[in-house]
Amino acid sequence: MLDISLIMLGAGNSSRFELPVKKQWLRIGSDPLWLFATKNLSNFYTFKEIIVVSKECKYMSKFAPNYKFVDGGETRQDSLKNALELVSSEFVLVSDIARPCISSELFHKIIEAAAQADCVVPALKIADTAYLGENAIDREKVKLIQTPQLSRTTLLKKALSSGEIYTDDSSAMRAIGASVWHILGDEMARKITFKEDLVKISALKAPENELFVGSGFDVHEFEKGRPLVLCGEKIDYEFGLKAHSDGDVALHALTDAILGAAGLGDIGELFPDTDDKFKDISSIYLLQEAYKRVQSVGFVLTNADITIMAQKPKLSKLKSKMEANIAQALNLSQSRINVKATTTEGLGFVGRCEGIAVMASASLKFYNWTQI
């Protein structure tokens, strides 16, 4: 058995995907695409190391604590160089997380060809007429290069150290005189780049119909001379709430609930009160940015429930406006948002009119890419 490590490249921003969710976080069943693609390859072979390159290493490690995670670079090549620093095996197999349908047949053809060259590459032929600019070219000479690509580790490290930019491993290997062997690729191994490419994974399992629930709690004390804002609604009252931001304690609790349901930490981690750029910032903005983060990793909000505990001011007549503000900010139906207001019957710091406390809960489900 060959000594091989696996590198999965997944540090892209999905800028061409044009959906709120990054493609690496589309769910196949309950697994995100990057994990599904990695498990798929690891089912075919016992790798010395499995290394995933990402810009979300801390979050990804929750899903696969036995993998190694490496921060991505500015380019694919930078990302690969970062990952290669952890590789000590004789061979390294490099693939993209956006190729979830690599077959066992293709994989084993690559491994079996290892003795043929320093780098083994799957490539597709083209059936259509091809042009380069205004000139027709011989399509028999055109190859569409795919991954995974198998290389000798020492040679690939050398190839990438030159400073030249290459779009795949085989190009770098060829540039240093290493031998490259092409095998026939597989249509199912085509890369998902655009949302229209989702048809390529239409045979895979749709996202599980799971529900994820998070809770949030926050407290702010009253402060003279500040405006009072709750759920994005400015309220006529003699006190505002002491805070680094605009002090919207209700939205802070809701933001924590949404982040918690996705396992993404809390509002203080995303928007620390030690950062001056968040000074007096609108909590509507913070909520929207947090929700974008939640959407990017494959979730959508199904409903939210907020309980505001305030002895004063009276809020019952403002609840519908508060719900509408949240619904508009998150582009949801108001029927998905519920705001309640209560007192503590004169008990505690809320009862003494020293501040306001809020509890919130939120539920999320997976983004359903099969309905696009």
Curated annotation (Swiss-Prot):
Tell whether Magnesium is among the UniProt keywords: no
Question: Which Pfam families does the record match to this protein?
Answer: IspD, YgbB
The record lists a divalent metal cation as bound by: 218, 220, 252
What positions are marked as the site Transition state stabilizer? 16, 23, 244, 343
> Which pathway?
Isoprenoid biosynthesis; isopentenyl diphosphate biosynthesis via DXP pathway; isopentenyl diphosphate from 1-deoxy-D-xylulose 5-phosphate: step 2/6; Isoprenoid biosynthesis; isopentenyl diphosphate biosynthesis via DXP pathway; isopentenyl diphosphate from 1-deoxy-D-xylulose 5-phosphate: step 4/6
Annotated stretches, region: 2-C-methyl-D-erythritol 4-phosphate cytidylyltransferase: 1-211
Question: Which cofactor is recorded for it?
Answer: a divalent metal cation
One GO MF annotation is: 2-C-methyl-D-erythritol 4-phosphate cytidylyltransferase activity
Gene3D superfamilies, per the entry: 2-C-methyl-D-erythritol 2,4-cyclodiphosphate synthase (3.30.1330.50), Spore Coat Polysaccharide Biosynthesis Protein SpsA, Chain A (3.90.550.10)
Site entry: Positions MEP for the nucleophilic attack: 139, 191
Superkingdom of the organism of origin: Bacteria
Query: Reaction catalysed by this chain?
Result: 2-C-methyl-D-erythritol 4-phosphate + CTP + H(+) = 4-CDP-2-C-methyl-D-erythritol + diphosphate; 4-CDP-2-C-methyl-D-erythritol 2-phosphate = 2-C-methyl-D-erythritol 2,4-cyclic diphosphate + CMP
Keyword terms of this UniProt record? Isoprene biosynthesis, Lyase, Metal-binding, Multifunctional enzyme, Nucleotidyltransferase, Transferase
Q: Which family does it belong to?
A: In the N-terminal section; belongs to the IspD/TarI cytidylyltransferase family. IspD subfamily.
Q: Which NCBIfam families match?
A: ispD, ispF, PRK09382.1
Q: Can you name this protein?
A: Bifunctional enzyme IspD/IspF
Q: Which gene encodes it?
A: ispDF
